[in-house]
Amino acid sequence: MNTFSQVWVFSDTPSRLPELMNGAQALANQINTFVLNDADGAQAIQLGANHVWKLSGKPDERMIEDYAGVMADTIRQHGADGLVLLPNTRRGKLLAAKLGYRLKAAVSNDASTVSVQDGKATVKHMVYGGLAIGEERIATPYAVLTISSGTFDAAQPDASRTGETHTVEWLAPAVAITRTATQARQSNSVDLDKARLVVSVGRGIGSKENIALAEQLCKAIGAELACSRPVAENEKWMEHERYVGISNLMLKPELYLAVGISGQIQHMVGANASQTIFAINKDKNAPIFQYADYGIVGDAVKILPALTAALAR
């Protein structure tokens, strides 16, 4: 048996739902999707859900993962085994841990490949900081997986599809975190997963002010701006949501233009699936050139304005 009888899908990030649904179609005969509102439910049915389970009644101060109890109860009530697919977001991983405990299921994070053999899930994901691929065969009746972005292509909606809708009522867990306040974060983040062209900057750009040069190039060619982990995590020059690498974004654009990025394996795991990689780096021995289809050895601060002017013509 190379499919599960049923799969359960949930995404706290609506943009990740289409790819999870496409994976679900390949892995199971029946697709159940948990959603938070009617709009997401309608989208899930168009993407192939046979049954939609609307999570309802959570107080605003409680976290999404507090639905784990009623989600696990629902899953158990409808089968003695099954596969649970979640995005590898922070909320997704927290929910995966809670579901794994309640379902007595093995949990595997950041899956890059999922297959079914003899009714059991086989999962591949990066290990040792991206230096190798690890393979796990999950033996528990239920398997809970968080899926890396780009593992599956996005499912296409079909308005002619139909499905059944159910409601799952909130039940307060015995122990939970209560949100006492929220603070809006200033962010210009975009959905980089869908970008055709990406310009990504590393510390080799020199300063936060020099990132404006990359932004001008983005405007000239219609690209989105990304960065390496040190730019976001160490220097705080850009938002966390924009860094590319094994522990965050895994991109597959048509063009990935790496500016001042050395090309360490942890970063390249997130960019190596790009159709074309173009690198600019002053160090001719930088590892990035081992991955690049095209490269320029030189100072990005001098090269970017000239490149922008040429491409803007």
Curated annotation (Swiss-Prot):
Pathway: Amine and polyamine metabolism; carnitine metabolism. GO terms for biological process: carnitine metabolic process; fatty acid beta-oxidation using acyl-CoA dehydrogenase. Keywords: Electron transport, FAD, Flavoprotein, Transport. FAD binds at residues 255-283. InterPro entries: DHS-like_NAD/FAD-binding_dom, ETF_a/b_N, ETF_a/FixB, ETF_asu_C, ETF_asu_C_CS, FixB, Rossmann-like_a/b/a_fold. Disulfide bonds: none annotated. HAMAP family: FixB. Belongs to the ETF alpha-subunit/FixB family. Heterodimer of FixA and FixB. Required for anaerobic carnitine reduction. May bring reductant to CaiA. This is Protein FixB. It comes from Escherichia coli O7:K1 (strain IAI39 / ExPEC). The gene is fixB.
